[in-house]
């Protein structure tokens, strides 16, 4: 590390998650895309984002349950920074997307027995 002579730097590795990617052709992703297109009037743009939401990896590894993460923030929201904000209309649009998503999932995904996968 480029530090002043009086500064010592040490790095200790902590815990980490295994990476997870849900296929864009998964029924849950397609249902989320349809809900977003209906609410926002345009097809969503897919991105891969890094993050550390530990349950996502566990849902995938332990339960075999794919996870769809959907964001409603805007680039200028300064998420996790000073003066963080979240536009109220984006919040309302997110609610509309999620209600349509739940309807879409209910009609798209296969029903499973209460005791099985």
What residue ranges belong to the model's regions?
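An extended, acidic, His-containing surface patch that forms the Zn2+-binding/catalytic region
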Residues: 2-117
């Amino acid at each position: 590390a480029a530090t002043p002579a009086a500064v010592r730097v040490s790095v200790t590795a902590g815990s980490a998650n295994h990476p997870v990617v849900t296929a864009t052709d998964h029924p849950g992703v397609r249902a989320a895309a349809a809900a977003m297109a209906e609410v926002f009037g345009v097809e969503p743009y897919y991105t891969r984002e890094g993050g550390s939401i530990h349950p996502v990896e566990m849902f995938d590894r332990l339960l075999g349950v794919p996870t769809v993460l959907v964001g409603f923030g805007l680039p200028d929201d300064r998420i996790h920074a000073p003066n963080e904000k979240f536009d109220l209309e984006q919040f309302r649009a997110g609610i509309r997307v999620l209600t349509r998503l739940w309807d879409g999932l209910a009609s798209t995904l296969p029903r499973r027995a209460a005791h099985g996968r």
